[in-house]
Curated annotation (Swiss-Prot):
Source organism, top-level taxon: Bacteria
GO cellular component: cytoplasm
Protein encoded by which gene: ybeY
Family according to the record: Belongs to the endoribonuclease YbeY family.
The protein's name: Endoribonuclease YbeY
Gene Ontology MF terms in the entry: metalloendopeptidase activity; RNA endonuclease activity; zinc ion binding
EC annotation from Swiss-Prot or TrEMBL: 3.1.-.-
Entries under Gene3D superfamilies matching the protein: Metalloproteases ('zincins'), catalytic domain
InterPro entries: MetalPrtase_cat_dom_sf_prd, YbeY, YbeY_CS
Amino acid sequence: MKIFIQNQQDKVDIDQHISKIIEESIVNTIKVFLEEENFEISVLIVDNSFIKELNRNYRNVNKETDVLSFPIFEFKNGKLLEDIVIMEDEIPLGDIVISIEKAAQQAKEFGHSLEREIAYLTVHSVLHLLGFDHIEEDDRKVMREYEEQILQSMGLTR
């Protein structure tokens, strides 16, 4: 599995520990649903102004958010809905954009560590790449159960 993490902000210091949390969150989420490990995910770490612009451009929502997911293939609840033929070694699942600035604000607001918030946002976003959503209440419950299960497996609880 290839995971690319790029930091494009300077408001919050990002160290190797944060990168490791992101990688572990991705791996632990993927392995719940997919047997193969030949996937690729890109993670972009940004500030609030950058993610606000993306949110406005891609979702027509003119406000900052904590995380955005950009899937490449169509999944539904962890199952691929289309046949794909990839000519490369890794199958690109999609891109994740995390506002580290928003994550730091939320960690403080919720009274837990930045590491826990980053892990949560990463797991949440990977679940979106895998076709989970939280628009309907039943879907939200399923997604929240997976989020908590994966975070607990990493030793990250509220």
